[in-house]
Regions:
Chain C
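C-terminal transmembrane helix and the adjacent membrane-cytosol boundary/short C-terminal tail
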Residues: 256-257, 268, 336-392
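Interhelical loop and adjacent transmembrane-helix boundary motif
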Residues: 308-358
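Membrane-cytosol interface at the C-terminal ends of specific transmembrane alpha-helices
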Residues: 175-194, 198-201, 232-269, 273-281, ...
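Cytoplasmic-entry segments and transmembrane alpha-helices of multi-pass inner-membrane transporters
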Residues: 104-109, 181-219, 247-254, 380-392
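Generic hydrophobic transmembrane alpha-helix motif, especially the helices
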Residues: 205-242
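Transmembrane alpha-helix signature in integral membrane proteins
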Residues: 74-85, 157-188
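Transmembrane alpha-helices
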Residues: 274-312
Length: 275, 334, 392
């Protein structure tokens, strides 16, 4: 598989090399919406080559945490936060990194597929380049490579100039993944990427995730316990008591969280007793 | 708000035990330079719009001041218009009267017709015709008022004149306000033409509001064995009441500001004429259109005062319409 | 979730349209039961209506010829006929089907009548303008001006070239002023939502109430009366732009607000600065709506007479320079010709009116096309070879 160079990118890994991707670490992250604290003291390390799953019942702050990881959180005008998020050791909220640079290096896939309706499939994949003002040597090759990595190439190779709205939901979501990959991010954040999809599409996305995990660090929020077990190696369980901010109750290797959790609440949750 | 650095906190897996007196940190570099430029550019555009529009209001006010100072309160009560005469004698009484009467005639016709047409398109017309009729109404709303005005002048008024003559002859003696020495160029006819222009825009708004009436409630009413009219009175009209008022108000705003119909139809007379079928009358807009050419210093100022008065009225009506329309919430009102 | 829902799934909404034989096409030919179309009315209803009409007619006839001293007028006859038909119809249906049904039927008639009153003018306006306009429209109407036309010339002589040119130039200039400013303001209102948003929205709302004559008066008394600028096309454009600006701003803002927030987030999450996300994602997504807004704004001002009456001066000769010298335009052409005492001039006005009507119709159709082309651009899906990009 060939991936053309993009500015700022490090060379892509060979098959047997150390996993590529950045190391992302949330350090003591707390979030507020206005005066309401929704997240408190979250510290999670998301390693390269590892898929990290964030699980927990609705409203426990997992998505908020995910959005702090690439500075999408602050798009809400009243949102504030404390703590820091380190990408390969640099604070993404610090003065050293530009906001747009942070978001380019830490991509995001949303709950609902959101391809740009005014663009063709190919334009959608290359949208990130246009949007970040990045020049590439061979645009077509990059489009092909990104679509291949997202596992969509064979389905759309003959209709790259068709509007993206004509794809099925699962295809649209993989297109969004391809779009994120085209700017060569170090980390890919996924916010319940399969919750709007049918089981077949879900399985395709999961396969894609597993194929990608050595190329880019992946963090996924999911409500689906089986999915977390299938795709992730590291797992963090979020929980929010009534009128209290969400916290990480327990985190560790996925296997341990699901088979032998330390905290009784984790056990209750992963065994489907609440949430 | 103090920024808390990463050095100030410790990662912990069991955070509820750790002390958490954190303050939200202040974020830096939310915007790139290009984004600052973009914001400034867009804001300057918005600012220009704001300034331009405000300027119009302010300018009208300043321009109107000399006339208002000269005429004082009599501006509202004087009928004749001779601002450049010696001594100047002018006021908006006749103009305002004509404006309101023609608009009232127009609205008396417009509102029921618009409501009927909206209901017809939404509820009675065959499904296949619905889109076409909707487009037709929207298209009508786009036809210039000038065309309606000359059409009225050449087709509608000559058509109506014998009927009006007949009505005057039959009822003139014993019904008040029905006398007329001559018909044709009357406020009534002007109002009629204005109604033709106001109906499409009013219909278009009302239809859209009524179409949003909750379908399941409509079906509920029908499923109970109600007639179509029963459904309309039980669900659609209560739902759309404020929309009807809002749409009518916007139509009224259009009617008040209409220039051409009045200029072409009316036989100009700066006086208050309650006999609406009789020739003669003036509206603010047509008064401005007719008088501006010969207006001197004070005359222009007086016209601006009249324009300001008209603008204030239409603005107030628009404002009320917005107020009423915003109050409408599905399910509210019985 | 899936965008193509609308076309991929069988329509689940319009329940009325589903027909029993739609899925029979692929199967072996079998006997399809005759398609039933449920009707809300029955033949007896028709008979009742027809009977009422006839009864009302004869009653009216009796009234007019035997009982009343009125002169018989066709219009009055029709009115009385209608007035009598309503109660007769009501009584007949009440007798047969009860009070609610009778009321329903009566209201149906009334609503139909009301709708007729709304639709009749459009037919008559278009028909009458077309009829009178076609009588004078000759090719020379588009190539000649009124410069050498005297009071004794025939109605088919002379033309409106100077007015058409004037209208096109003034409309283009007004659009060039109002649309960028309006769209910029809309972007501010919907994308930046800065501190100016409230006052801007307030004055824009207020200005939609501005009577068009007042816009003309503003330009006239600000620039023309103090001799800062003589009457010319650009001043007409300015007055028209003032009328367009609030409309374009408000419609464009509504259009931008409909753009899903998820698209903005997607663009920002890719690392785009705000300005690129607006320029490359938000505006293109909304372009159909924006185009419609602009075209409808143009249709609204192209026929405005009052403001140009005060600002462009009006002339009978061709002046292609909108920046200096009097300029004519179509509404002004119609207005001055129609007020003339010469029969031939009046005839010519209808030619101008017809052109104006056609221009508005064209703009309207254009707006419809732009609007419908918007959601999901449907382009021919050509089988391209892998990786090859086209259409760039």
């Amino acid at each position: 598989m060939t991936v053309p160079d993009v500015q700022h990118t490090r060379p892509m890994p060979e098959a047997d090399a150390r996993p590529a991707g950045g190391v992302l670490e949330g350090v003591d992250v707390s979030c507020w919406f206005g005066s309401r604290k929704v997240l408190e003291g979250v510290g999670i390390k998301m390693d390269a080559g590892v898929v990290t799953a964030l699980i927990g019942p609705s409203g426990c702050g997992k998505s908020t945490f995910l959005r702090t990881l690439n500075r999408m959180h602050e798009l809400v005008p009243i949102a504030t936060l404390a703590g820091s998020v380190l990408l390969d050791g640099d604070d993404i909220y610090g003065a050293g990194l530009r906001l747009t640079e942070v978001r380019r290096r830490i991509g995001m896939v949303f709950q609902k597929p959101n391809p740009f309706p005014a663009m063709t499939i190919a334009d959608n994949v290359a949208a990130g380049l246009k949007l970040t003002g990045t020049k590439v040597r061979d645009r077509d090759e990059l489009i092909e490579a990104s679509l291949r990595r997202a596992g969509l190439w064979n389905e759309v190779r003959n209709r790259l100039d068709a509007p993206a709205g004509g794809l099925s939901g699962g295809q649209q979501q993989r297109l969004c993944i391809a779009r994120s990959l085209a700017v060569s991010p170090d980390v890919l954040l996924m916010d319940e990427p399969c919750s709007a999809l049918d089981p077949t599409s879900t399985r395709r996305i999961e396969e894609t995730i597993l194929e990608l995990k050595d190329q880019v660090t992946i963090v996924i929020v999911t409500h689906n316990m089986q999915q977390a077990q299938r795709v992730s190696q590291h797992c963090a369980f979020f929980l929010a008591a009534e009128n209290e901010p969400g916290r990480v109750v327990e985190q560790g290797p996925t296997e341990q969280i699901f088979s032998d959790p330390e905290d009784p609440r984790t056990a209750d949750y992963v065994n489907g007793r609440f949430g | 708000m103090q920024p808390t650095g990463p050095e100030g906190s410790v990662t912990s897996d069991m955070p509820e035990k750790g002390p958490h007196a954190q303050e939200p940190r202040k974020l830096e570099a939310r915007l790139t330079d290009a984004d600052r430029l973009y914001r400034a550019f867009v804001a300057s555009g918005a600012g220009a719009t704001l300034v331009l529009i405000t300027l119009i209001g302010v300018f009208l006010l300043i321009g109107a001041l000399p006339a208002l100072r000269t005429a004082g309160l009599s501006f509202l009560t004087t009928q004749p218009w001779a601002p450049d005469g010696q001594p100047p004698k002018f006021g908006v009484a006749a103009m305002m009267f004509g404006t309101f009467v023609s608009a009232a005639v127009a609205m008396v016709i417009t509102v029921p017709v618009a409501v009927c047409t909206s209901l017809f398109i939404n509820e009675y017309a065959p499904r296949s015709l619905r889109r076409g009729l909707t487009s037709l109404v929207d298209l009508m709303a786009a036809i210039p008022s000038l065309i309606f005005a000359i059409w009225g002048l050449f087709l509608l008024v000559p058509l109506l004149q014998p009927i009006e003559d007949w009505a005057v002859a039959q009822f003139g003696g014993w019904m008040p306000l029905m006398e007329a020495s001559a018909t044709g160029g009357s406020l009534f006819n002007a109002g009629l033409i204005i109604a033709c222009m106001a109906i499409p825009i009013t219909t278009s708004i009302i239809r859209e509001v009524l179409a949003q009436a909750p379908r399941h409630e409509c079906e509920g009413a029908l499923a109970l064995g109600g007639t179509r009219w029963g459904m309309i009175t039980a669900v659609i009209l209560p739902f759309g009441r404020s929309g009807i008022v809002g749409g009518s108000m916007l139509g009224l705003g259009r009617a008040l500001g209409e220039t051409l119909a009045a200029t072409l139809i009316l036989s100009i007379a700066f006086e208050i004429k309650p006999r609406i079928l009789e020739n003669g009358g003036i509206t603010v807009a047509s008064g401005i259109a007719i008088e501006f050419r010969d207006a001197q210093e004070l005359g222009l100022s007086a016209l601006m005062a009249a324009g300001l008065a008209l603008f204030l009225v239409t603005f107030a009506i628009n404002f009320l319409a917005a107020l009423v329309a915003n109050r409408s919430r599905p399910g509210a009102g019985a | 979730m899936t965008a193509p829902e609308t076309k991929a799934l069988p329509s689940t909404s319009g329940t009325g349209e589903r027909r029993p034989d739609t899925d029979a096409g692929a199967g072996p030919p079998r006997k399809v039961p005759p398609r039933r179309r449920p009707r809300a009315w029955r033949w007896t209803d028709m008979m009742e209506t027809a009977g009422s009409l006839v009864a009302a007619f004869f009653l009216t006839w009796l009234l007019f010829t035997r009982l009343l001293p009125f002169r018989v007028m066709p219009v009055a006859f029709a009115v009385v006929w209608y007035a009598l038909f309503l109660p007769i119809h009501w009584l007949v249906t009440k007798d047969g089907q009860g009070r609610p049904a009778a009321k329903d039927r009566l209201v149906t008639v009334l609503i139909g009548t009301g709708a007729m009153f709304a639709f009749a003018p459009i037919v008559f306006v278009i028909g009458y303008v077309g009829y009178r306009g076609l009588k004078v429209l000759r090719p020379n109407f588009f190539t000649e001006t009124m410069q050498i036309v005297g009071p004794l010339s025939k109605a088919t002589e002379g033309g409106a070239l100077h007015s058409i040119i004037g209208t096109l130039e003034q409309l283009a200039l007004a659009t060039a002023i109002a649309v960028p400013l309006g769209v910029l303001t809309a972007v501010y209102l919907s994308e930046i939502q800065g501190p100016l948003a409230r006052p801007v929205r307030l004055v824009a709302d207020a200005m939609t109430a501005l009577p068009s004559i007042v816009a003309g008066l503003f330009v006239y008394s600000l620039l023309i009366k103090p001799h800062l600028w003589l009457q010319s096309g650009i001043l007409g454009s300015l007055a028209l732009a003032i009328l367009m600006l609030p409309t374009v701003t408000i419609t464009a803002e509504q259009v931008l607000r409909v753009v899903p927030g998820s698209l903005r987030e997607a663009a920002l999450a890719l690392g785009a600065p705000y300005w690129r996300s607006v320029l490359l994602v938000v505006l293109p997504t909304a372009r159909a709506g924006l185009a419609t807004a602009v075209i409808l704004g143009m249709a609204r001002v192209v026929g405005e007479t009052a403001p140009v009456l005060m600002t462009t001066g009006g002339t009978t000769v061709l002046n292609t320079n909108p920046f200096s010298g009097h300029q004519d335009n179509l509404p002004l052409f119609v207005f001055t010709q129609i007020r003339s005492s010469q029969e031939t001039q009046v005839e010519r006005a209808w030619g101008g009116a017809l052109i104006l009507l056609v221009v508005v119709l064209l703009l309207f159709v254009l707006a419809r096309i732009a609007g419908s082309a918007g959601s999901g651009r449907r382009r021919a899906r050509f089988p391209g070879r892998g990786g090859q990009r086209r259409g760039r």
